[in-house]
């Protein structure tokens, strides 16, 4: 009775899980063997009109339950305990028990086959040559070929690792947090892009922001909405003629028409109309979600999940077929699976129904109609599907199943009939009449049965590959005789198998023990008997094979690609040799080759240049011959009566150059003395004319010249004879200026005679021997040319040029004399004694100090220059003083290095606020003051203390810890960065400007050296004492002080058509506008004038101004904060804002003050009434008085003007000019 309970226990969860795993395995293997388009997950149901063996029993179950009118109870024959038999209400589940038990037995058989193949493979590996056979068996068992490990792998995009599965790769990518900056706040998942993170967040929030305008559908992504919108598109060219549905392509329409054709065939075959909507290419169930297109590792892992020893479709025997040979039908005998526990040696059963009938008929009391099952008429007619294990009771069900499941296996729908005929001729099914069906007699206890084939009661066994004959087996038809005494049956507690004897039971347990000792891989399910093999196999799952290319040398570097290794070898381990084409010597580097060329193949030849004629020589012998033959003074005339040619050559103390004569030495020394220095920049010049031209071209004006000074500041007088140079030096010492030489004294010896005076007969010449007076020269026409020729040096052309220049300057001085018929008067008129200021008391005691040594007792700047040349070996006349921080340097290289490192003097200088480019740091520093937001407040931004002057600014700068700090530092008023001492002084002067100091916006400074004047109460003079002494301007300063008593200096006033940025006066307003445009593009004129609105480029500022008017007034970006005016350029705005500052301070024109002319007449003489031509040149000044009358410019004492008056003969003077000038002179 215990055996019955174990056999008839109900379906357990363990058995159901096992069946589900086996079913999943079958679906996977079917997907792998058949096409990927075949839906293996389709399971027919009763609603589809498909009949299955399960559905037959389920339909017949209610009938069997309804016919159970007289249930009886019985005892088992031979059972001592007398337990009740199971009730017949469990009979409808018999087929389910058989189904589960059948698949469980198949799983056990597959597991046994797997163990057998593993043993054979192990034995073949040891013997050698058996591995191939085992692998082929395994391939046949699983239906899959073992592929290489590299196939189907996934490589990380951030590193070199590869993974066999996509899930492993996705999990690994999350470890690269440095490459995935965006994190989901819900699940902490990392993403590379923000859009991916936002798209992922919509899965958590269920946001559907993209809604269809035609229906109520909503989507979380825009591309999904676009795909959905195509369903509403009515403009599709391909329309279905049956359902009027549109398609974009002909292929889609053709696929759709195949569906209509298929549905029509199903309806014609009598199928269920409800099944017409089924698509043969639909997605499978969850158990078959493993795609057949996946990699080998995926399918093997899914197979391992289904069962520890999952079967393959290749293990299941094919469906048995009946072979009609010669009219006789042979059928293969099925393998018995069930045995009776009471008579196991007598008979075996292939189904639970036969075993149940056997138990009820032989081993228990008869039960009237206990297991009688109603037989339907069509139950005996079974049709099997060739491509799967399903059976059907009619042809329509088989056809519907074939069309729905195996549509792509057939060439055309018409082949169904051929397929049916082929199955009929092959004997796959055999229709049977209802009379041939087995009938169970009411008396189940009698051993006698009807003489019918025992195989007819058995179901179709698909696990048997052998064909069974249709004729009944005589041995199987023998009635079962109950044994006299049932032997003992041994049941296995692991698999519930019943064993007839103990020996079988022990062998069966050994198989379980051997199976338990197997080490099963948790990744792929492979069983391994030994621990070492198991470990090696598990390590192989985590092993990712890669390749790298190592450098075989001692560097030990590795590379992922062979190209990188080759590049490394070429760059690191290949020695490039340079071969000298002259001597074939090899060098390893370019530097070594250069050194070799310099040492071995370079020959230095000294060039000897003659300083007199500039001829080159390559040997000392040639040079000495040249000097002896061409520049020796032995054969030349003497310079004077008592002088003779020097016996030794003269050598320059600065550059060690050798000169053959004293005159040549003086010419050479003049090249070292560039005493004319520009007051605005460090440039120096030999000749004053070059300085004047430099001032006009670079600084917009002309250097102040003293018209009434007879001193001609040219150093070329040193080129004259030594007595003349000595006389010039003595004259210069009287003026306390070593750089200015008096030509009158220097050329005094050029005109012979000891007595005589200037002629009075309108420029008549006197005799050459008459000496001039003490205070006058002879007329240039009375020059003793013979004496001049007698003193001529070996350079007559140069002496002639010097004499001609002197004569021209003396002629100009004569033409400006009070009377035209007198000789040249004294060019030094007596200065007014009342207005001439006395020399400063410390002028004679002023000392200069050298910045390179500790010497401070130098009495003049010329002595300072000489000291630097002699003591510090400075061979250039260029100043080595920094123009920004006033630092002195020993060499030009040190000064340039200082400018590059501290003041950034190279390249363009760009303002970091407005991106404007300037040519120098000084201009940039002045420009940055325009961006100062605090302006001329004069208050400290840290503590708010007012700063009165520059000294207070510097003193207060130290209070905030900036005194000892090195540049750059921040301004205490505007917080701008100051990069140099010049910029610091500029900010100090800018922020300490006071509007209460007499209306002046600037403190008085020298017009030449820009240094503040020590005392502003002396007068409106714009020159300091040092500049007056240096440039011999003492007389001019006295003349400036005279009109100061009659008219005070007015403040800066507004002048029409004058640029307020550079004080330049333009002829009309259009020129002023063009001039302001040039200010805007200062430093970049070579690139043209471009429009910042449309990028148009013009070559002239006038074209740009005309073009800017096309953009309209609304395009002007710069507006004034004091008035509603707007401008196109920043320079226009700055000019306009400075005009606001100057207009309220304009005063009415003062009374005209008659200022004596620069070239005034001598005392006691009347003004010249003769017509003259007056040329006026305006210089850059800080104050210009506004003109009351536009046609009459007023002369202000602060203005520096140079008037050159030229005398014109009466016969060449144009008519009308004389009268006009006379009227203007009389009005003045």
Swiss-Prot record:
The keyword Lyase does not apply. In embryos, it is expressed in posterior spiracles and peripheral nervous system. InterPro entries: Znf_C2H2_sf, Znf_C2H2_type. One of its GO terms (molecular function) is zinc ion binding. It holds the Pfam family zf-C2H2. Residues 1179-1204 have a biased composition (Acidic residues). Residues 34-47 have a biased composition (Low complexity). It is found in: Nucleus. This is Zinc finger protein 423 homolog.
């Amino acid at each position: 009775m215990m055996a019955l309970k174990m056999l008839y226990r109900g379906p357990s969860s363990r058995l159901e899980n096992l069946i589900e795993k086996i079913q999943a395995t079958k679906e996977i293997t079917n997907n792998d063997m058949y096409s990927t388009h075949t839906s293996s997950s389709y399971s027919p149901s009763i609603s589809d009109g498909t009949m299955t063996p399960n559905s037959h029993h389920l339909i017949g179950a209610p009938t069997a339950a309804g016919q159970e009118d007289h249930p009886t109870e019985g005892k088992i024959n031979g059972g001592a305990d007398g337990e009740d038999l199971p009730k017949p209400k469990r009979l409808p589940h018999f087929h389910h028990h058989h189904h589960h038990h059948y698949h469980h037995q198949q799983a056990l058989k597959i597991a046994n086959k797997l163990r057998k193949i593993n043993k054979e493979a192990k034995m073949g590996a040891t013997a050698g040559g058996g591995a191939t056979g085992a692998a082929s068996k395994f391939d046949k068992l699983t239906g899959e070929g073992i592929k290489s490990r590299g196939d189907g792998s996934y490589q990380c995009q951030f590193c070199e690792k590869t993974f066999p599965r996509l899930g492993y790769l996705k999990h690994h990518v999350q470890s690269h947090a440095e490459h995935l900056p965006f994190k989901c706040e819900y699940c902490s998942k990392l993403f590379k892009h923000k859009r991916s993170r936002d798209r992922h967040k919509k899965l958590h929030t269920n946001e559907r922001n993209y809604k269809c305008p035609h229906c109520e559908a909503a989507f979380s992504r825009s591309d999904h909405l676009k795909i959905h919108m195509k369903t509403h598109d009515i403009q599709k060219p391909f329309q279905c003629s049956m359902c009027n549905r549109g398609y974009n392509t002909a292929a889609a329409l053709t696929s759709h028409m195949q569906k209509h054709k298929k549905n029509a065939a199903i309806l014609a075959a009598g199928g269920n109309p409800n099944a017409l909507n089924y698509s043969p290419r639909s997605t499978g169930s969850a158990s078959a979600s493993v795609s057949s297109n996946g990699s080998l590792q995926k399918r093997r892992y899914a197979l391992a999940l289904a069962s520890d020893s999952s079967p393959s479709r290749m293990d299941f025997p094919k469906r048995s077929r009946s072979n009609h040979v010669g009219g006789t039908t042979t059928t293969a005998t099925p393998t018995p699976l069930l045995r009776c526990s009471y008579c196991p040696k007598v008979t075996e059963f292939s189904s639970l129904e036969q075993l149940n009938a056997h138990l009820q008929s032989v081993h228990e009391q008869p039960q009237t109609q206990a297991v009688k099952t109603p037989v339907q008429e069509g139950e005996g007619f079974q049709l099997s599907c060739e491509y799967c294990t399903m059976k059907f009771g009619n042809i329509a069900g088989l056809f519907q199943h074939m069309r729905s499941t195996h549509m792509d296996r057939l060439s055309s729908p018409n082949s169904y009939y051929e397929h049916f005929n082929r199955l009929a001729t092959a004997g796959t099914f055999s229709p049977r009449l209802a009379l041939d069906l087995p009938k169970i007699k009411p008396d189940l206890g009698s051993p006698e049965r009807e003489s019918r084939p025992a195989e007819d009661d058995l179901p179709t066994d698909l696990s048997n590959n052998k064909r069974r004959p249709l004729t009944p087996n005589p041995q199987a038809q023998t009635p079962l005789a109950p044994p006299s005494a049932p032997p003992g049956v041994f049941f296995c507690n692991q698999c519930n198998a019943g064993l007839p004897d103990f020996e079988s039971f022990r062998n069966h347990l050994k198989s379980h023990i051997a199976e338990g000792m197997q080490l099963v891989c948790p990744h792929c399910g492979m069983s391994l008997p030994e621990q070492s093999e198991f470990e090696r196999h598990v390590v192989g799952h985590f092993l990712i094979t890669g390749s790298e290319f190592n450098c075989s040398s001692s560097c030990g570097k590795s590379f992922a690609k062979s190209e990188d290794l080759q590049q490394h070898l070429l760059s690191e381990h290949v020695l490039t040799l340079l071969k000298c084409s002259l001597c074939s010597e090899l060098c390893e580097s370019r530097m070594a080759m250069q050194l070799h060329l310099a040492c071995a193949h370079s020959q230095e030849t000294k060039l000897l240049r003659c300083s007199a004629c500039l001829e080159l020589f390559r040997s000392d012998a040639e040079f000495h011959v040249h000097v002896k033959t061409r520049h020796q003074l032995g054969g030349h005339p003497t310079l004077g009566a008592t002088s003779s040619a020097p016996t030794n050559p003269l050598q320059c103390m600065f550059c060690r150059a050798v000169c053959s004569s004293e005159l040549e030495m003086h010419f050479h020394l003049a090249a070292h003395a560039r005493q004319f220095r520009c007051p605005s920049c460090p440039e120096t010049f030999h000749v004053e004319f070059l300085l004047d031209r430099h001032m006009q071209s670079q600084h917009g004006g002309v250097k102040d010249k003293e018209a009434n000074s007879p001193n001609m500041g040219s150093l070329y007088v040193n080129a004259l004879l030594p007595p003349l140079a000595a006389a010039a030096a003595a004259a210069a010492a009287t003026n306390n200026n070593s750089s200015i030489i008096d030509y009158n004294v220097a050329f005094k010896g050029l005109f012979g005679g000891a007595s005589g005076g200037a002629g009075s007969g309108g420029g008549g010449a006197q005799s050459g021997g008459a000496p001039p007076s003490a205070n006058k020269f002879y007329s240039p026409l009375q020059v003793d040319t013979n004496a001049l020729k007698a003193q001529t040096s070996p350079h007559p052309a140069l002496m002639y040029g010097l004499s001609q220049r002197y004569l021209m300057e003396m002629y100009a001085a004569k033409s400006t004399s009070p009377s035209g018929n007198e000789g040249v008067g004294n060019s030094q008129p007596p200065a007014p004694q009342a207005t001439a200021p006395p020399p400063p008391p410390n002028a004679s005691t002023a000392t200069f100090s050298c910045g390179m040594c500790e010497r401070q007792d130098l009495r003049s700047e010329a002595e300072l220059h000489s000291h630097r040349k002699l003591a510090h070996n400075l061979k250039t006349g260029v100043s080595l003083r920094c123009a920004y921080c006033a630092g002195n340097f020993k060499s030009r290289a040190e000064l340039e290095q200082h400018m590059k490192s501290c003041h950034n003097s190279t390249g363009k200088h760009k303002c970091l606020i407005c991106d404007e480019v300037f040519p120098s740091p000084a201009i940039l520093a002045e420009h940055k003051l325009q961006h100062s937001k605090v302006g001329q407040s004069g208050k400290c931004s840290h503590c708010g203390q007012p700063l009165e002057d520059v000294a207070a600014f510097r003193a207060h700068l130290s209070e905030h810890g900036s005194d000892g700090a090195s540049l750059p530092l921040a301004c205490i008023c505007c917080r701008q960065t100051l990069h140099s001492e010049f910029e610091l002084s500029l900010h100090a002067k800018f922020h300490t400007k006071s509007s209460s100091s007499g209306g002046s916006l600037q403190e008085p400074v020298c017009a030449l050296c820009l240094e503040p004047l020590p005392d502003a109460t002396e007068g409106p003079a714009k020159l300091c004492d040092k500049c007056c002494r240096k440039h011999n301007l003492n007389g001019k300063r006295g003349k400036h002080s005279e009109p100061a008593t009659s008219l005070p200096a007015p403040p800066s006033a507004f002048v029409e058509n004058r640029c307020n940025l550079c004080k330049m006066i333009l002829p009309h307003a259009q020129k002023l506008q063009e001039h302001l445009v040039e200010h805007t593009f200062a430093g970049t004129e070579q690139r043209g004038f471009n429009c910042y609105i449309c990028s148009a480029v013009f070559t002239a500022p006038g074209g740009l101004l005309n073009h800017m008017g096309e953009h309209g007034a609304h395009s002007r970006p710069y507006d004034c904060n004091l008035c509603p005016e707007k401008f196109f350029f920043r320079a226009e705005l700055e000019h306009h804002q400075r005009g606001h500052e100057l207009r309220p301070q304009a005063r009415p024109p003062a009374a005209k003050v008659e200022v004596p002319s620069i070239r005034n007449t001598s005392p006691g003489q009347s003004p010249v009434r003769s017509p003259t031509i007056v040329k006026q040149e305006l210089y850059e000044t800080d104050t210009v008085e506004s003109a009351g009358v536009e046609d009459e410019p007023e002369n202000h004492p602060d203005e520096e003007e140079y008037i050159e008056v030229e005398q014109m003969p009466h016969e060449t003077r144009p008519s009308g000019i004389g009268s006009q000038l006379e009227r203007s002179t009389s009005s003045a």
